[in-house]
């Protein structure tokens, strides 16, 4: 499959899953702020690995991820209705820590810059 087509499919599935999580899932366990950071659909369109970033405590992250995993069948069905593909991919949800990792590195750099500024005084 052409690389650019797979990229378009990834983005379309990502957009629809974001909309589904935001508008259609009414699970009380969804306590943290949830964002879909990226989606990787396999070449045969059978599986979609969905990377989710959850802002909140570790406990709320675990609870929110479990709520989303229990809603995976609903999400798959809705994606099948909204995105016209030969196969509706099976949704595999994974926690994405990259945003928090980036924030941690940014804090470290800020601390170094502040320390350097204080040492020069």
UniProtKB/Swiss-Prot annotation:
Disulfide bonds: none annotated. Its main location: cytoplasm. It is found in: Cytoplasm. GO terms for cellular component: cytosol. GO terms for biological process: maturation of SSU-rRNA. SUPFAM superfamilies: Ribosome-binding factor A, RbfA. Transmembrane segments: none annotated. GO terms for molecular function: ribosomal small subunit binding. Keywords: Cytoplasm, Ribosome biogenesis. Belongs to the RbfA family. Monomer. Binds 30S ribosomal subunits, but not 50S ribosomal subunits or 70S ribosomes. HAMAP family: RbfA. NCBIfam families: rbfA (TIGR00082). One of several proteins that assist in the late maturation steps of the functional core of the 30S ribosomal subunit. Associates with free 30S ribosomal subunits (but not with 30S subunits that are part of 70S ribosomes or polysomes). Required for efficient processing of 16S rRNA. May interact with the 5'-terminal helix region of 16S rRNA. This is Ribosome-binding factor A. It comes from Clostridium novyi (strain NT). The gene is rbfA.
């Amino acid at each position: 499959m052409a690389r650019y087509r797979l990229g378009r499919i990834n983005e379309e599935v990502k957009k629809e899953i974001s909309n589904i999580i935001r508008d259609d899932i009414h699970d009380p366990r969804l306590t943290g702020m949830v964002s879909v950071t990226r989606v990787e659909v396999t070449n045969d369109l059978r599986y979609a690995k969905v990377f989710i970033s959850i802002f909140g405590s570790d406990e709320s992250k675990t609870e929110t991820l479990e709520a989303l995993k229990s809603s995976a069948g609903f999400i798959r069905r809705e994606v099948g209705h909204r995105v016209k593909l030969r196969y509706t991919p099976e949704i595999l949800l994974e926690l994405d820590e990259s945003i928090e990792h980036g924030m941690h590195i940014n804090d470290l750099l800020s601390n170094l810059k502040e320390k350097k500024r204080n040492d020069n005084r």
